[in-house]
């Protein structure tokens, strides 16, 4: 005896130990009216073929119906242009040394100006431009007067490297 769970109810069928799945499908067709070729029988997590036999007594067989249609297998998308490589920032070893200078007496002086905003806190240096200092974190800009900057630094301003 096996239990057959259909869509609406559970059937009890007398099945011999050596009986194949095709004969079980025919018994279900007689009881329920579902054609044998549309039935899909599942037992122990796998679908049974018509030639399978040797189902245990008091086993539960699930009846599923054949479904029409289904989604097509999609093609893998082929891109015409290659992927754009992300820009990797250059690693500078001991970059902190650019922010400080040590004289012959051993005195440490800051080369860059620190940001005064309370949101940045200490240790955030501002970028040096020709006429201003700029904080990349809080976007604070301090404009430097060109007359005083030229007098203190001894340079005329303009682009670096050209003399």
UniProtKB/Swiss-Prot annotation:
Keywords of this entry: Isopeptide bond, Metal-binding, Ribonucleoprotein, Ribosomal protein, Zinc, Zinc-finger
Keyword 4Fe-4S: no
GO cellular component terms, A-Z: cytoplasm; nucleus; ribonucleoprotein complex; ribosome
Domain of life: Eukaryota
Pfam family, one: ubiquitin
GO biological process: modification-dependent protein catabolic process; protein ubiquitination; translation
Family stated for the protein in its record: In the N-terminal section; belongs to the ubiquitin family.
Protein name according to UniProt: Ubiquitin-like protein 1-ribosomal protein eS31 fusion protein
Protein source organism: Caenorhabditis elegans
Name of the gene encoding the protein in the UniProt record: rps-27A
